[in-house]
From Swiss-Prot:
Pfam families: GlnD_UR_UTase, HD, NTP_transf_2. This is Bifunctional uridylyltransferase/uridylyl-removing enzyme. It comes from Idiomarina loihiensis (strain ATCC BAA-735 / DSM 15497 / L2-TR). SMART domains: HDc. Has four distinct domains: an N-terminal nucleotidyltransferase (NT) domain responsible for UTase activity, a central HD domain that encodes UR activity, and two C-terminal ACT domains that seem to have a role in glutamine sensing.
Length: 879
C-alpha cells in the first residue's frame, strides 16, 4: 500500500496517528484532498486520479482503524465494490466488509462497541460508507443466493486488521466459492439484461447513466467479473494471457473505461455529490470540465457524440466477449457440425461463422457476410470469432467500402433482397459496418441534438426508421399499420423507400438545410450505384420532402381545402404520396417512444386519403369536392339520427342553423352525437358540455354548445390546463343564430385519453362553474420542470398567407411550458381577437402551434393589428 503522506503532489496535513482521532482535523484533511483532487483533474491522468483516491482512503481508513484500537482485535477490514478494485470517484460509495471471528460474548460486545465508534466516525466525516460486518461463514452462506454479495467477495481487498482472518477468508474464496463459472456467468448475464431493460435496452438515452446504461462502466465490469471468477484472478491484464481477449481488445476496453471514468469524475465534481446520471442540468458544466469549451449546446453535442461512440464500442466488446466466453470457454460452440453456405462462410448454432481466419482479407466479404445473413433466414446472429475477425478487418480499412464497385453491387443486392433491411441491416448498424461503407454515415454516428424531441442519435434514429419500414412487410408485425402494409405490398421499388430512409437525415450536423444536402447525397449515391434516373429522382425527392407530410398534418388545418390542394400540388403523383406516407409514419415512430399516438396516425391518414382522392382525379388540376363530402356526412348522420328515433323535420330544422363548414369539418358520428344532445336539451340548461371518445382517435373530445359570448376559448383553456389536460386541436364554429359549437381534442399529461367517470365529471363541473361565472378562471402559473429549465426557445410569430379573406393564420414557436395555451388565449382576448381554430404541436421542449383568428367584425387582421398582436405575444411569452 502506497504512503500518501509521501506523495510529491498532495501535501495535506495528516492527523497524528498516535493521538485520539479528531473529527475537525480529519474534515480539514478531506477538504484539502477534495480541493487537490478537483484541481488535479484538469491535467492528471484519470487512471492515476481514481487509484490515488483509493490509496488515500486506504491510508485514512487504516489509520482510523489503528486509532480506534482495532489493530489487535480478531477482525479485519476489506475494501469491496469499486473500492475493492482500487478505484474511487469524488462521490463514490466507500464499500467496506468487516470480517470478524467467532468470539465469546464479552469479547464480541467489546469489539462491537469499537466497530460502532469507528463506523460512526466515518459517517460524521460525511463519507458515503456502505459497510457490513460478517463472519467468514456468513459471507459464503449469504453469497449462495445473492449474486451481488458473491461479486463483492470476488473483488475484496485487504486493508488492515487480522491478516490471518483475511488469509482464511481468501483461501476459502479460492477453493470453495459457492458459484460455478457457468452459474455465475448466467446470473451476471441475467443481471445485465434486467439492467439494460431499465434503460429501454439502448445506449442512446438523452440523460444516460454513465455507470448503468448499456455500454456504460457496468458493462465493462461485467466482462471482468465473469472472467475473474472463471480464471480466479484479480488482475485484468491476466485475461489476455488466458486467451479471454486479445491485447488490442484489452487496450480498447481500457481506453473506453478511462474515457467513461473521466466523464464520471467530472460529473461528480459538477454535481458536488455522487451522481451517475448525465442530466441536462450538468451536461454544459461537464463539457467545460472535459475541455469541450463553453459554447453551450454545441459543446454538449460534441461531448455527447464522443460519449455515444465510446458506449457503442463498449456494447460491441461486451456482447462479443460474453458470447466468446459462453461458446469457447464454457464449451458450448459446435463448429464441427457447421453447415457450409459458401467457400467463406458457414452456419453453426444459427450463427454466421467464418470458415477461415483470412476471410476478410477480401474486404468485399464484409458486405457479402450480411448478404449471406439475408439469404439464410435460419441465421440469428454472428459468431464471436467472426465478430473478432470483422472488427480487425474494419480497423484496417483505408477508404469507404462504397468506393469498390464489387462492394456496391453487393450492397445493392442487400438493399433489394426481401430480408436485406431486417436482421442484416441491424447487424451492420450494430457492428459499425454502415459507417465503414458510407463516409456520410460515419459523420452521423453518435450525432445527437441537445433537445427533448430527438431521443436517439441520428444514426440510431435512422436505423430505427429503416427497421420500421422493414416491419411494414414483416409477417411478425402484421396488422399493426394496415395502410402502410397495403401500400408497401404494392410497391415495385421498395428499395427506393429504404434508400430514402437511409439518407433522410444523413446531412444533419453539417450546417445548412439537411433535407437539401441529403437530397444531393442521395442523388449522388444512386448515380454511383447504378440506379436509373427514375429511381434517383424518387429517392432524392423523398429525402428533400421527408418532413412535408408531417408538417402539413400536424401544423396545418387539414380541413382547409386550400391546405390539401397545396400539399397535393407538392406531391403531384399517387406513387410519391404512397412512399412519402410510409416514410413519414416510420420517421415519427423512430424519433422517440412517446411521439406516436392515434391522434397523429389519424391526422396523417386523413391527409393521405384527402390527397389521394385529389391525385386520382383525371383533371390536370384536381380539386377537392367539398359539396360532395358535406352531402355524404349529412346523409350518414341523418341515417344515424333517424335510427335513434328523431324526426327528419326536427333534424333539418336544427341543421339549418349550422354552417356548411361544420358539416365539412366533422364526421357523421360526431354530427349525430352533437345533434342528439342538442335536440334533447332544454334551452335553459345551457351550456351543453359533452365529453367522450366519439372521434375514435384515441383521444378525448370535448364539445361545448353555448350562447355566443366571445372569448369562450380563454376560459375553457384555463380550466383544461388546471385539470392537467393538453389541448391538441380546437375548432370554434358559430351557428347562424348566435350560438357557438366549440370542439376540443384533448389528452391527459401522460398521453392517455380521459376515461375515468369521476375525472370526466370533475372537468365538466369545473367548466360549468367557470362558464356560469360561479368561480374565476383558474390560474395557470406553475414552475417549469427540471428538464425544461435547461432549454431556451426564442418566441417567434409567423403569419401565413391565405386566400381566406375573413381570417388570419399565424404560427407560434416558443418554449413549451405549463399554461401556455391558456396564456395565449388570454392575450387574444386582450387584443379583441377571436380564435376560430387551433392546432397544438409539441416538439420536445418546443411548442409549434397554429392559430386561425379573426376580428370581432369577422375580418382578417390588418397589418397594424398583426404587428401589435405579434409584439404582445413575444413580450408576454418571453422569460
Amino acid at each position: 500500500m502506497a504512503n500518501v503522506q509521501e506523495d510529491k503532489d498532495f501535501h495535506g496535513r495528516w492527523p497524528d496517528r498516535t493521538l485520539q482521532p479528531c473529527l475537525k482535523d480529519y474534515k480539514a484533511l478531506l477538504e484539502s484532498y477534495q480541493n487537490w483532487s478537483a484541481a488535479r483533474f484538469v491535467t492528471a491522468d484519470i487512471d492515476e486520479l481514481v487509484h490515488h483516491r483509493a490509496t488515500f482512503f486506504d491510508q485514512l481508513i487504516s489509520q482510523l482503524w489503528q486509532q480506534f484500537q482495532l489493530e489487535d482485535e480478531p477482525a479485519s477490514i476489506l475494501a469491496v465494490g469499486g473500492y475493492g478494485r482500487e478505484t474511487l470517484h469524488p462521490g463514490s460509495d466507500i464499500d467496506l466488509l468487516i470480517l470478524v471471528g467467532p468470539e465469546n460474548a464479552e469479547a464480541e460486545a467489546k469489539l462491537s462497541e469499537k466497530l460502532g465508534q469507528f463506523v460512526t466516525f466515518l459517517w460524521d466525516l460525511h463519507l458515503d460508507i456502505g459497510h457490513s460486518v460478517r463472519t467468514i461463514e456468513d459471507c459464503f452462506a449469504q453469497s449462495e443466493n445473492d449474486i451481488t454479495i458473491a461479486t463483492n467477495l470476488i473483488e475484496s481487498r485487504y486493508l488492515s486488521g487480522a491478516e490471518s482472518l483475511y488469509n482464511e477468508f481468501h483461501q476459502q474464496l479460492l477453493n470453495d466459492f459457492p458459484w460455478s463459472s457457468r452459474d455465475f456467468y448466467q446470473a451476471k448475464l441475467d443481471e445485465q439484461k434486467q439492467r439494460h431493460q431499465q434503460y429501454h435496452s439502448t445506449s442512446y438515452n438523452l440523460e444516460p447513466n454513465i455507470k448503468s446504461s448499456p455500454g456504460g462502466l457496468r458493462d465493462i465490469q461485467t466482462v471482468g467479473w465473469i472472467a475473474k471468477r472463471h480464471f480466479r484472478t484479480h488482475s485484468d491484464e491476466n485475461l489476455v494471457e488466458y486467451g479471454y481477449m486479445t491485447a488490442d481488445e484489452f487496450v480498447e476496453l481500457r481506453d473506453c473505461m478511462n474515457w467513461l471514468w473521466r466523464i464520471r469524475f467530472a460529473l461528480h465534481l459538477e454535481a458536488g455529490k455522487r451522481e451517475d446520471r448525465l442530466l441536462f442540468d450538468f451536461q454544459p458544466g461537464v463539457a467545460v470540465r472535459l475541455g469541450y469549451g463553453n459554447d453551450g449546446k454545441a459543446s454538449v453535442e460534441t461531448m455527447m457524440k464522443d460519449y455515444f461512440k465510446v458506449v457503442l464500442r463498449v456494447s460491441e466488446l461486451n456482447q462479443m466477449l460474453l458470447q466468446f466466453f459462453h461458446q469457447a470457454i464454457l464449451g458450448t460452440q459446435d463448429l464441427q457440425h457447421a453447415e457450409h453456405i459458401s467457400d467463406d462462410f458457414a452456419v453453426a448454432n444459427k450463427l454466421l461463422t467464418a470458415r477461415h481466419d483470412n476471410v476478410f482479407d477480401n474486404h468485399c466479404n464484409i458486405i457479402r457476410a450480411f448478404v449471406c445473413i439475408a439469404e439464410h433466414p435460419q441465421i440469428q446472429g454472428i459468431h464471436s470469432n467472426t465478430i473478432r475477425l470483422l472488427r480487425n478487418a474494419r480497423a484496417q480499412l483505408s477508404e469507404p467500402l462504397s468506393h469498390d464497385p464489387e462492394c456496391r453491387d453487393l450492397f445493392n443486392q442487400l438493399i433489394q433482397h426481401p430480408r436485406g433491411c431486417g436482421l442484416s441491416f441491424a447487424l451492420m448498424h450494430h457492428h459499425s459496418v454502415l459507417a465503414s461503407y458510407l463516409s456520410q454515415w460515419q459523420q452521423i454516428v453518435g450525432q445527437m441534438q441537445f433537445d427533448l424531441f430527438h431521443a436517439y442519435t441520428v444514426d440510431e434514429h435512422t436505423f430505427r426508421l429503416v427497421r420500421n419500414l422493414y416491419r411494414f412487410s414483416d409477417e411478425d408485425y402484421q396488422d399493426q399499420f394496415p395502410l402502410c402494409e397495403k401500400l408497401v405490398a404494392q410497391m415495385d421499388r421498395r428499395y427506393c423507400l429504404y434508400l430514402a430512409g437511409i439518407f433522410h437525415d444523413i446531412a444533419k450536423g453539417r450546417g445548412g438545410d439537411h433535407s437539401e444536402l441529403g437530397e444531393m447525397d442521395a442523388r449522388n449515391f444512386c448515380h454511383q450505384h447504378g440506379y436509373s434516373e427514375e429511381d434517383a429522382e424518387l429517392v432524392a425527392w423523398l429525402v428533400r420532402h421527408h418532413l412535408t407530410m408531417s408538417v402539413t398534418a400536424q401544423k396545418r388545418d387539414i380541413h382547409d381545402p386550400e391546405v390539401i390542394q397545396d400539399f397535393a400540388n407538392q406531391v403531384s403523383t399517387p406513387e410519391r404520396l404512397d412512399y412519402l406516407y410510409c416514410l413519414t409514419v416510420a420517421d415519427i415512430r423512430a424519433t422517440n417512444q412517446s411521439l406516436w399516438n392515434n391522434w397523429k396516425a389519424t391526422l396523417l391518414e386523413e391527409l393521405y386519403n384527402a390527397t389521394s382522392y385529389l391525385l386520382q382525379q383525371d383533371s390536370n388540376k384536381p380539386t377537392l369536392d367539398i359539396r360532395q363530402k358535406i352531402n355524404e356526412n349529412k346523409a350518414s348522420a341523418m341515417a344515424l339520427l333517424l335510427s335513434a328515433g328523431f324526426e327528419k323535420a326536427e333534424i333539418l330544422a336544427l341543421w339549418g342553423r349550422f354552417t356548411a363548414d361544420y358539416f365539412f369539418r366533422h364526421t357523421a358520428e360526431q354530427i349525430s352525437w352533437h345533434s342528439q344532445h342538442i335536440l334533447n336539451l332544454p334551452s335553459e340548461q345551457l351550456p351543453l358540455i359533452l365529453i367522450g371518445d366519439e372521434n375514435n382517435y384515441g383521444t378525448t373530445e370535448l364539445f361545448i354548445y353555448h350562447h355566443e359570448e366571445g372569448h369562450l376559448f380563454a376560459s375553457v383553456a384555463g380550466v383544461l390546463d388546471s385539470q392537467q389536460l393538453n389541448i391538441l386541436d380546437a375548432q370554434i364554429l358559430a351557428t347562424r343564430d348566435g350560438f357557438v359549437m366549440d370542439t376540443f381534442v384533448v389528452l391527459q399529461r401522460d398521453g392517455k385519453p380521459l376515461t375515468e367517470p369521476h375525472r370526466i365529471e370533475e372537468v365538466k363541473q369545473q367548466l360549468l362553474d367557470v362558464l356560469h361565472k360561479r368561480i374565476p378562471v383558474p390560474s395557470t402559473k406553475r414552475p417549469l420542470s427540471r428538464r425544461m429549465k435547461n432549454f431556451s426557445v426564442a418566441t417567434e410569430v409567423t403569419f401565413i398567407p391565405s386566400k381566406h379573406h375573413g381570417r388570419t393564420t399565424f404560427e407560434l414557436v416558443t418554449l413549451d411550458r405549463p399554461g401556455l395555451i391558456a396564456k395565449l388565449a388570454a392575450i387574444l382576448q386582450q387584443q379583441n381577437v377571436i380564435l376560430l381554430a387551433a392546432k397544438i404541436t409539441t416538439i420536445g421542449e418546443q411548442a409549434e402551434d397554429l392559430f386561425i383568428v379573426t376580428t370581432e367584425q369577422q375580418t382578417a387582421l390588418s397589418d397594424k393589428q398583426k404587428k401589435t398582436l405579434k409584439a404582445k405575444i413575444i413580450k408576454d411569452l418571453e422569460f
